[in-house]
Design a protein with these regions (language model features):
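Conserved lysine of the Walker
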Residues: 44-45
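Hydrophobic anchor at the beta1->P-loop junction of P-loop NTPases
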Residues: 36
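Short glycine-rich substrate-engagement loop in P-loop NTPases that contacts/grips substrate
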Residues: 60-92
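Interdomain motor-coupling "hinge/lid" segment immediately C-terminal to the ATP-binding subdomain
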Residues: 2, 8, 125, 131-240, ...
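Accessory nucleic acid-recognition modules appended to NTPase machines
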Residues: 200-343
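Structural recognition of the conserved hydrophobic beta-strand(s) that form the central parallel beta-sheet
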Residues: 94, 119-125, 145
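A cross-kingdom feature that marks ATP-driven nucleic-acid transaction machinery
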Residues: 1-14, 27, 54, 277, ...
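Walker A (P-loop) phosphate-binding loop of P-loop NTPases
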Residues: 40-41
Length: 396
């Protein structure tokens, strides 16, 4: 136990978290079992250590961070370790990469039943279905998703500002006033393209080639997260990677040709749809459906999950419009439902709001529809039903 406590103190003391993630405010920390899911490289470890640093003194033995990558846990279960920690006065156990432990869900259930005064916060892959696939945790675990940096968090990090998030309703009703609070302090256009290119994943702060780092992370998502958690044989990995690349290469302008994709990777249509779902769970893809439809039906659009992925896979041929629409869907995806639009709009949000994403210069030769919200790029200001696209990056 002493060795784990020493490691905990060292990690908490040296954690580098220059921006406080908004999820920290959204979690009800009074719950006894909290699961934090997120894609690889999104900052889950830093988030746990940041929580420990905020809530506990560094020498407080009531809180302990452990990582299931530690070889110690190849011969010791979570419940036994938690019991020893509890009997030594421990009350908050932070478990990183919980899925690396066999029978992790039943072990967590045992902890929950045996130690009513012990709080457990654990992290896992976005591919995990915490409640659907682990019935023993149903009703007792509170699940949250840690996302990549929003444009707001990115700007706060680079400029030292502390801009707050806004709801979609606030932005639509009061965007002209909100913009007046932001523009005197920062020029969003100076940072927006950088964010689109490399601002979503926290490791952009590291002094390494970002695209290479992201490609390695994407490979780990498919090789470890999807194969390990979904228990897929290694021989199918090349099919999943080839499918992902073909979808990325084709872009999102038309619905995927599932029959052609199945032929190209030599598998069935049903398997293609399953692979697409796994890639979506891994936060590599977003599926866009017409209103009233959902998986397992064929989506109307398959998009990359965030714009950074576009530049990592196909940097020379990224179309500006595709990058902007990818940003739009990704930033709204957290709290809103996005469906394909009609003739006069790109997307329907929450079943009622019509959005069109376009270059501000296109507005000069268009008839403005009063029931459409125009999210414009290449501008910092808005008026009426025309809002600057970058401001949607302040939703979280």
């Amino acid at each position: 136990m002493e060795a784990f406590l020493r490691t905990h103190r060292y990690l908490v003391e040296h954690v580098n978290a220059p921006v406080r993630r908004n999820l920290m405010n959204e979690i009800n920390w009074n719950d006894r079992l909290i699961g934090i899911k997120g894609t690889r490289g999104i900052g889950k470890t830093t988030f746990l250590l940041q929580y420990a640093k905020e809530k506990f003194d560094i020498s407080d033995r009531q809180c302990l961070y452990i990582n299931m990558n530690n070889f110690y846990f190849q011969g010791h279960g979570i419940a036994d370790f938690a019991g020893e920690f509890y009997h030594h006065g421990g009350r908050t156990l932070l478990i990183d990469q919980v899925f690396k432990q066999p029978d992790w869900s039943s072990e967590l259930r045992k902890c929950y039943d045996l130690y009513p005064n012990l709080k457990i916060v654990f992290t896992g892959s976005s591919v995990m279905r915490l409640k659907d696939e682990n019935p023993e945790l149903n009703g007792i675990v509170k699940s949250y998703n840690l996302r990549g940096f929003s444009f707001r968090e990115f700007i706060n990090l680079l400029t030292g500002n502390d801009f707050r998030p806004y709801t979609l309703e606030e932005i639509l009703e009061d965007h002209e006033h909100i913009i007046k609070q932001i523009l005197p302090k920062v020029s969003p256009n100076r940072y927006f393209q950088d964010y689109i290119h490399h601002g979503f994943y926290p490791f952009f702060q590291e002094h390494r080639n970002y695209s290479e780092n992201l490609l390695k992370t994407m490979n780990m998502m498919t090789e470890v997260d999807i194969l390990l958690i979904k228990q897929i044989e290694l021989k199918y990995l090349t099919k999943i990677k080839k499918l992902f690349y073909q979808i990325a290469e084709e872009g999102s302008k038309k619905a995927p040709n599932v029959s052609k994709l199945a032929h190209d990777i030599e598998t069935s249509r049903a398997t293609v749809m399953n692979y697409i779902k796994y890639l979506t769970d891994a936060r590599l893809l977003n599926l866009i459906y017409p209103i009233g439809e959902e998986f397992p039906k064929k989506p109307a659009k398959v998009m990359l999950h965030n714009s950074n992925l576009l530049y990592a896979i196909y940097p020379i041929q990224v179309e500006k419009q595709e990058a902007m629409e990818t940003f739009f869907v990704n930033t709204l995806w957290k709290d809103h439902k996005v469906n394909t639009g009609y003739r006069d709009c790109n997307y329907i949000v929450d079943g009622k709001m019509k959005f069109r994403i376009l270059d501000t210069h296109q507005m000069q030769r268009m008839k403005i529809q009063p029931d459409v919200i125009y999210a414009r790029y290449n501008t910092e200001i808005g008026r009426g039903n025309q809002i600057p696209l970058w401001l949607l990056g302040f939703l979280y």
